[in-house]
């Protein structure tokens, strides 16, 4: 049973990340790597805006702008991966400094690393996260983003924190 649930989790992860990657690549074709000019704090703010909108919609139970909430979650995934890529390459005024092939490779490597971490955490936690409410995920995302904003304010000089990537 446990193996079946984990298999289902990995299948779900793979499907969601395939959608995220498809969206990332499509937007990259449309806009190029224009996001490379974003500073880390700007990416954190973009993530915060997306998570805050999700929370607002969860509380209001209706929306006036009919954007699919799934799209907001996909945006959270892609902005998160972009933020980690920015950490690797640094932001730049010359958004064409790194080829799209390299950026795509970095994206794919991060997805692979995340998948491996998911498998390890599921082993240790026994998929307890499946019992959580979706609204709890939203709250946890917001808490993590507020922590990252504080780390940025501290200029990454943290006493005990592992840093934003964790």
Predicted segments — roles?
Residues 1-166:
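Intrinsically disordered, low-complexity regulatory regions
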């Amino acid at each position: 049973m446990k193996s079946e649930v984990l298999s289902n989790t990995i299948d779900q992860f793979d499907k969601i990340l395939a959608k995220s990657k498809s969206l990332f690549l499509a937007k990259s074709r449309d806009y190029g790597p224009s996001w490379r000019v974003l500073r880390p704090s700007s990416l954190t703010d973009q993530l915060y805006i997306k998570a805050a909108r999700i929370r607002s919609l969860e509380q209001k139970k209706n929306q006036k702008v009919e954007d699919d909430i799934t799209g907001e979650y996909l945006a959270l995934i892609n902005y998160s991966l972009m933020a980690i890529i920015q950490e690797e390459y640094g932001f730049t005024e010359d958004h064409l400094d790194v080829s799209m092939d390299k950026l795509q490779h970095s994206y794919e490597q991060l997805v692979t690393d995340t998948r491996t971490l998911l498998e390890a955490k599921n082993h240790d936690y026994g998929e307890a996260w499946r019992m959580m409410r979706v609204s709890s995920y939203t709250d946890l995302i917001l808490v993590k983003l507020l922590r990252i904003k504080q780390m940025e304010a501290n200029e990454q000089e943290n006493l005990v924190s592992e840093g934003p990537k964790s």
